[in-house]
Each structure stands twice: as structure tokens, then as C-alpha cells.
Amino acid sequence: MCGIVGAVAQRDVAEILLEGLRRLEYRGYDSAGLAVVDSEGHVARLRRLGKVQVLSQAAEEHELHGGTGIAHTRWATHGEPSEENAHPHISEHITIVHNGIIENHEPLRELMIGRGYRFVSETDTEVVAHLVHFEQKQNGGTLVEVVKRVIPQLRGAYGMVVLDNRDSSVLVAARSGSPLVIGRGVGENFIASDQLALLPVTRRFMFLEEGDVAEITRRDVRVFDKSGQLATREEIESKVSYDAGDKGAYRHYMQKEIYEQPMAIKNTLEGRFSHGEINLSELGPKADELLAKVEHVQIIACGTSYNSGMVSRYWFEALAGIPCDVEIASEFRYRKPAVRKNSLMITLSQSGETADTLAALRLSKELGYLGSLAICNVAGSSLVRESDMALMTKAGVEIGVASTKAFTTQLTVLLMLVARVGRLRGMDAQIEHDIVHGLQALPARIEQMLSQDKLIESLAEGFSDKHHALFLGRGDQYPIAMEGALKLKEISYIHAEAYAAGELKHGPLALIDADMPVVVVAPNNELLEKLKSNIEEVRARGGELYVFADEDAGFTSSENMKIIPLPHIEEVIAPIFYTVPLQLLSYHVALIKGTDVDQPRNLAKSVTVE
């Protein structure tokens, strides 16, 4: 959600800022803007409603010279999408961009109006601009000193960058609940909400921690921690590919990322097998001692990550014999959970910056959990830094808002973790052997399945005029049905719901008619005969069935039942495998409906506010 880019350099930075915004478009936004300050303190600000391309075209018509600047893509929270509400916001010589939500903006707005300030937008960000201006006018000091005095007045989440056009040599950044990363250059430095924005200009990064305030000049970066003391933050060399944001020959990022899944899973497995066993030595030398004590697993996540957690619940209990609960982060953090003895908290997040998941992790430290383990796709993210242990998915950068390869690599890591914990609890060695064999075969199996893309594309037309869809699964395929429904609603805007197939008689059956497509995932397992009975219930009521079935499951297509035969797959990896055709189905339905596949309306890739 929202994107920030800033630069302090000896060269003109407007194009650096615009390119950074282009590389952040995946985060979701409705307007964009930038401000550039030249050496004489003249500010040039441009803001436009709509895409970054609109802003870029406007920039070509203006003189945007200057070595210091900030830019922003806005996802509307306070105030409608409009040019007036777009960032940057200005209060005389103070210019600011901001991600997050200032919860006490209304009383602060009244306070500033009482002090004689006039507001030209509906945003909470303009409040902060006026606060900084007032504080500097009243009490003086350097910009970083002023920002440090303003921060205690703010309640909520923010990642902000401030400049004072009277001193164009410095930017000040502050982070609380919304990520910021500093890019180090030679005689120039940068800041952004995601390192991807800065890869064209640097590969050296420094991640700000919670409560940090940073003073950024061309030659130096000073970081102050939440106590106001000078702090050192580790500088890392990014391994993210420069062209990670390139679609290549694919029409959409989502399509590219679906097809990247075999390689993403290979990368995630690399180095994690040893002598036919799962090797997770990256957890550290004390991990086995801690994991051997685990008597319960609590998984916390949001969205697609929640669905992967739901799958792993079946694995933890059936394979490792450990009770497991899965909860939505935004629910967990606002109740009073009774923590079980020796419970391990596992958090799941693609970005590692999901606001509710981070808040739940921080809460867990007060509740007496045995330890915390993050499964994440972004090294150096807040979730990784703040957890006791971390396992990285190695999916590579995921741009499409609708998660694909991050989901399947999360499941891959979770299954490896189940095997590792299970071994410590005396799990049958044959089970781990089956998991290892299944995971090693998985990339090739998915490659084989992707060859069915044209067949799946031919089914999409049947959804083009539908307003609702139902997804059914049983056992560990029920969360896969949930994920399939989520994908369809995210990118095609068709209302889709998922149910455990055994629940049909308890309500959903009332919805079945000829206008209700019903998608079923049907691997050849011990629940197949039960599932066939559920399918017959739908057929008897005229529902239009689309059954993704094991080729050995004994299904044949009929007038209102289309069978999509899939290769037989080892049961332990079937949930990962059956995810992919549902991703393809959703993608092709969205193409037919003409929606914005990579940036669906009202959604953002990284949900960094509550």
C-alpha cells in the first residue's frame, strides 16, 4: 500500500524518483506525485490522479531540476482519490510524503486550525506537514531534531520522509509500523518503502527498525533509535535481481509468476536436503532443542498466507502429531488468547511487513509463547528481524497483487518444517522419505500440469457472465478451495465462496442452480468417494460443475460436469499441486472479463496499515 521514494544526490533526481514509483506500482495506488528541490531552494511539485505514467508525461512538460526530491504513490484512506489529496503535501517550506494512518489526525487538525493553519486536503498527512512547520517555527532546531519532537504527538502507523527546501542537502525519514529502507550510494543516498524501487541506483541497503528516525545527506546517514540515541543499522548487499520487475514475454506479472513456480520451488528446496532428510540448519544451533519442546503450534497470517497456514494445520496434526491452530492476524491481536503450554508461534507473510501480522507477533512476546518463527519471502523484513527464527521462501520478487508463487513456496517450506518437527517427535522415517520424494518431484509435476493451460483457458468462458461461484474441497484440499475462491474474487470481481464439501447440506446447497458454477478439487485419496457424493448432490440440482480430478479418480464428463484430468500426484504434495490449475482458471476468467489482473481495484500488494 502506498509507495515512497526519496533521493539526495549531486545529479537531477526526477527520473530516479519516477522510475522508483514505476517499480512500486504493484503495491496498489490511485494517485502519484513528486517534489524536487534545486540548490537555490526552489520546489517543483507535480501531482496527478491515476497511473504513474500520467505523472511521468506531466513531468516531461515541466522543468524538474534538482538533486533532492521525494515521490509517492497514494492508496486513499483519508480523503477520496484526487490531485488535492495526492502527496507530497506542503506547509510553506516543509514538504512531506507519508505511508500509514495517523489515528489522532482529527484533534491534531483542529489544533492546527486553531493555530491559524489552512488545510487544502482531507488527508492526515497534511496535518503532519503543518505540525513540523509549526514546531520548527516555534522552537527551531535542525530538521531531524524537529521531526523527533513531532513524533510523540502522533498516534498510529507511519513511514514518512520530510524535506525543508531551505536546506536541500538533507532528508529526514521516520518509521513506525510502515517499512522504509535506505539505499547507499557514492556521493548520493536514497530511501524507499521497498528496495525494489532503488535497484537501478544501488544494491546496498539499510533497513530502518521500528521507531527509527534517519537523517540522510549525500555523504552520510545517521540513524536514531526510538530512545533518540544514535544507532547502527546493518548494511546488506541485495541479492534481488535488477530485472525482477520485468514481465518479459508474459502479458501480466501474475501469468509470469504462475509459470515461475517450478523454479521458485526448486530455489526454495535448494540446500535443504541432506542424506535423504530435511535440513533446516539455517534455523540456528539451538533450534532443535526448542522445536523438540513444541507441544502446540499457533499460526498467524492474513489473506493467502492464512490459507497456506490452514493447509499446514492438516500436516502438523496428521504427520507430526502436533495440535495446530490457525488464526487471522487481525482477529488474534484484538482478543485475549489462552496460550497453550510450549506453544510455537508461526507467522506467515510474503512481504514480512503485514501490519496485523507484525502486531500479532509483537503481542505474542508478551503472552508467553515458547518462541516465534517467521516464514517470509523478504530477507531483512520486520517480521524476519523480530522473530526468534526464520525460514525464507525463495520465490523471488512477486509483483502481482494476487499471490501465486509466494503461496506455493510457503506451503513448500511449511511441509519441510512439519517433517523436521515430526522427526524430533519420533515421526516414522518413511513419512519424511515420502515428503522428501514428493517435494523433489513437485517442480516437474507442476511443469507437466502447466501444459494444460489451454484446456483450462477454454473453461474460463463459462464464468464470464456469472456473478457468483462456489469452490468445494475436502480435507487438506478445503483450504485450496478457499485459495481458489480468493483468487477468483480478487482478480475477476466474481463473488466466490469456498466450503468444505461436507457442509453443502448445511446451507450452500440452497444456492445451487444453472447460474452457479461449482469448482471442485478432487485428488484420488481416502475422501474421494465422500466427495463424489457431494458432487452428485450438485448435479441433481442443475449446478454446473468444473472438477479438477486425478486422472485415476474415475470421473467422466457429462452435460453439466466438465472434468479436467490432472496427473496422479503423491498425496502429501497434492494441496500444492492442485493450487496451480485454480490460479490459471482465475487468471483466464479475469482476462475475459477485462479486469486489471496485476492491480485489482481497491487492493494493494503489501498491506502495511491496519
Swiss-Prot record:
Keywords of this entry: Aminotransferase, Cytoplasm, Glutamine amidotransferase, Repeat, Transferase
Q: InterPro entries from the xrefs?
A: GATase_2_dom, GFAT, GFAT_N, GlmS/AgaS_SIS, GlmS/FrlB_SIS, Ntn_hydrolases_N, SIS_dom, SIS_dom_sf
Q: Which terms does the UniProt entry file under GO BP? A: carbohydrate metabolic process; fructose 6-phosphate metabolic process; protein N-linked glycosylation; UDP-N-acetylglucosamine metabolic process
Residue intervals of the Glutamine amidotransferase type-2 domain:
2-219
Q: Where in the sequence is the active site?
A: C2, K605
Q: Name one GO cellular component term.
A: cytosol
Which Pfam families does its entry note?
Answer: GATase_6 (PF13522), SIS (PF01380)
* GO MF annotation, one: glutamine-fructose-6-phosphate transaminase (isomerizing) activity
Question: What's the Enzyme Commission number for this chain?
Answer: 2.6.1.16
| Residue stretches making up the SIS domain | 287-427, 459-600
Looking up CDD domains in the UniProt record yields: GFAT, SIS_GlmS_GlmD_1, SIS_GlmS_GlmD_2
- Self-association or partners: how does it assemble? Homodimer.
Enumerate the PANTHER family for this protein.
GLUCOSAMINE--FRUCTOSE-6-PHOSPHATE AMINOTRANSFERASE, ISOMERIZING (PTHR10937), GLUTAMINE--FRUCTOSE-6-PHOSPHATE TRANSAMINASE (ISOMERIZING) (PTHR10937:SF0)
Q: Which NCBIfam families match?
A: glmS, PRK00331.1
This protein's name: Glutamine--fructose-6-phosphate aminotransferase [isomerizing]
Source species: Pectobacterium atrosepticum (strain SCRI 1043 / ATCC BAA-672) (Erwinia carotovora subsp. atroseptica)
